[in-house]
Swiss-Prot record:
Gene: mdaB
Family indicated by similarity: Belongs to the oxidoreductase MdaB family.
The keyword Repeat appears for this protein: no
Top-level division of the source organism's lineage: Bacteria
Source species of the chain: Escherichia coli O157:H7
Principal localisation: cytoplasm
Protein name: NADPH:quinone oxidoreductase MdaB
Cofactor section: FAD
GO cellular component, one term: cytoplasm
UniProt GO molecular function: NADPH dehydrogenase (quinone) activity
Complexes and interactors: Homodimer.
Amino acid sequence: MSNILIINGAKKFAHSNGQLNDTLTEVADGTLRDLGHDVRIVRADSDYDVKAEVQNFLWADVVIWQMPGWWMGAPWTVKKYIDDVFTEGHGTLYASDGRTRKDPSKKYGSGGLVQGKKYMLSLTWNAPMEAFTEKDQFFHGVGVDGVYLPFHKANQFLGMEPLPTFIANDVIKMPDVPRYTEEYRKHLVEIFG
């Protein structure tokens, strides 16, 4: 089976206690272990060891990013984790931007060293799904993955490939934790079962 690293981006802040992301991390941990996978979990808002986190990325076949949507993207603690770990991973997670002075025609973003690995986003948002998918709504129909394009590209810069994104919507205005956990279990079984 696979080695799966879960980055838990939950954070207590303002009106959010991070409980839903903690719950979904627990759901993923239990479901994936039941399916026979090895799982490691790190909390982005912790005193992680940067060198150990690079080794976690090398160990993992799949990285799951569990996080809330804050101000149209990842929480700053998740971005800090990426900045710390990906930068430390120069030479092991990526070699360069893919181009050289001798051959600048090579494609930018092709210097990743972890080809064959995959990543998945698991997101929680107060916005309803139609805010992402309908052209006359807030995100003008670009979809969830369109909103997360820079986040996807950061992972793809390392050479990783995306798995289908999971999102729990309307988590503050219309919370339904039993539905979210059941839908997430189903999503995980479809991908990793």
